[in-house]
């Protein structure tokens, strides 16, 4: 499970942090800690938003993969008035509309990996689709 952030929600905190010296060197989590979803749910939402009948392709787990990743945005709410304004479905819809308007760019699989060994996931090393 994960918490997914829409970029505009993050920027509403990051931009003011540049000007507030009291926030210098502080660690502040930004994210929608009220919406904790599975990757399967994200795939289902993407399928619905795009109008495609997408079926997930399951790969073996990556070594030491984090199963649940979330944060507490309490400090961001307190210091920066952080509020999640864009829920997951709206964020995916906005992102899909942006990509559809701009056009799909090919994915570059030729990025070299800094560390390549037996623990490197297959999906990082070879083209899957």
Residue ranges and their predicted role:
Residues 75-111:
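A contiguous, mid-protein "functional segment" used to position or interact
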Residues 15-16, 44-47, 96-97:
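Solvent-exposed alpha-helix faces
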Residues 7-11, 16-29, 34-35, 52-54:
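Glycine/proline-rich active-site loop of Rossmann-fold NAD(P)-dependent oxidoreductases
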Residues 10, 14, 30, 42, ...:
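Non-catalytic, hydrophobic alpha-helical segments
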Residues 7, 35, 39, 69, ...:
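Amphipathic alpha-helical segment in the mid-to-C-terminal domain
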Residues 1-8, 32-35, 63, 67:
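Glycine-rich "substrate-gating" loop/helix at the edge of Rossmann-like oxidoreductase active sites
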Residues 19, 51, 97-101:
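Residues at helix-coil transition
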Residues 25-29, 37-43, 51-68, 73, ...:
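C-terminal "lid/loop" region of Rossmann-like NAD(P)-dependent oxidoreductases
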């Amino acid at each position: 499970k994960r918490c997914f952030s829409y970029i505009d929600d993050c920027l509403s905190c990051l931009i003011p942090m540049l000007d507030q010296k009291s926030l210098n060197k502080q660690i502040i989590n930004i994210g929608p800690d009220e919406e904790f979803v599975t990757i399967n749910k994200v795939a289902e939402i993407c399928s619905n938003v795009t109008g495609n009948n997408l079926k997930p392709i399951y790969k073996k787990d990556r070594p030491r993969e984090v199963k649940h990743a979330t944060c507490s945005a309490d400090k961001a709410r307190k210091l920066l008035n952080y509020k999640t304004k864009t829920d997951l479905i709206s964020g995916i819809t906005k992102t899909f509309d942006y990509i559809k308007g701009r056009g799909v760019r090919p994915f570059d699989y030729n990025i070299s990996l800094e560390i390549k060994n037996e623990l490197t996931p297959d999906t990082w090393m070879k083209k899957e689709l």
